[in-house]
């Protein structure tokens, strides 16, 4: 930890790996998304390890779910996105895959939220856009956001950039982040490393630092 102008400046991962400084964000680990990702089961397993480590020390946990609006509430942007993802040129062929109570929208059973976890539904790619996430983090005095889930190139990179713009420090658990397109996911990870504002690590390192923070006097 460094200091400037009387303020702490976290520079090492260990500076943020404790229950007071950081929250764990599990991004869009939904039944209908897991099945679209190569290696989805592996990402679930890695997220589960991170989640168990966070819960063991009482770290705050937040889940996001991507929603689709009913067609009556789909506007131009939502139709354009859905047409792209569903590989159709006709708006009439679009199906709202992730309606609020649809089975595909549910969090995967291996990672079910508890009553102590925050679950936020969103329409945008960034976990901060249109949700109270930033307010909730600031209200709890949280600086760091450890992020895992699916997909790196679709929503995790935008969330990381948005987090930095809002004054939070993103921690990317790289081996717990899946991608729908391997090359695009790799480019996103390389871009985040190049920009340098996010801390990039792996789940086992993160879990070990959490355990150490809990056992330290």
PLM features per residue range, with description:
Residues 1-23, 49-52, 56-57, 74, ...:
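Active-site-adjacent betaalpha module
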Residues 30-35:
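Short acidic, Gly/Ser-rich segments with clustered Asp/Glu that frequently serve as metal-coordination loops
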Residues 20, 38-54, 58-67:
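A short alpha/beta connector and helix-capping loop motif
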Residues 26, 59-66, 72, 173:
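Short beta-strand segments at enzyme active-site cores
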Residues 29, 67, 152:
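A generic "binding-loop/recognition-motif" signal
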Residues 36-40, 183-184:
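Short, solvent-exposed loop/turn segments at secondary-structure boundaries
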């Amino acid at each position: 930890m460094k200091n400037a102008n009387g303020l702490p400046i976290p520079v090492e991962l260990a500076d943020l790996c404790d229950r007071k400084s950081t929250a764990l964000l599990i991004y869009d680990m939904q039944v209908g998304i897991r099945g679209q990702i190569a290696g989805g089961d592996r990402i679930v397993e890695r997220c589960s390890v991170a989640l168990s480590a966070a819960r063991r020390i009482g770290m705050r946990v937040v889940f996001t779910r991507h929603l689709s609006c009913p067609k009556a509430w789909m506007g131009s942007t939502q139709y354009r996105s859905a047409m792209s993802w569903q590989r159709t040129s006709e708006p009439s062929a679009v199906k709202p895959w992730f309606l609020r109570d649809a089975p595909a929208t549910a969090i995967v059973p291996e990672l079910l939220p508890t009553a102590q976890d925050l679950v936020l539904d969103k329409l945008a790619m960034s976990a901060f856009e249109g949700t109270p996430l930033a307010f909730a983090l600031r209200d709890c005095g949280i600086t760091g956001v450890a992020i895992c889930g699916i997909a790196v190139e679709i929503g995790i990179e935008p969330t990381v950039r948005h987090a930095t713009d809002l004054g939070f420090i993103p921690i990317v658990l790289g081996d717990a982040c899946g991608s729908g397109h391997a090359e695009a996911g790799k480019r996103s990870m390389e871009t985040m490393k190049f920009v340098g504002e996010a801390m990039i690590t792996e789940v086992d390192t993160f879990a070990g630092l959490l355990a150490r923070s809990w056992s330290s006097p």
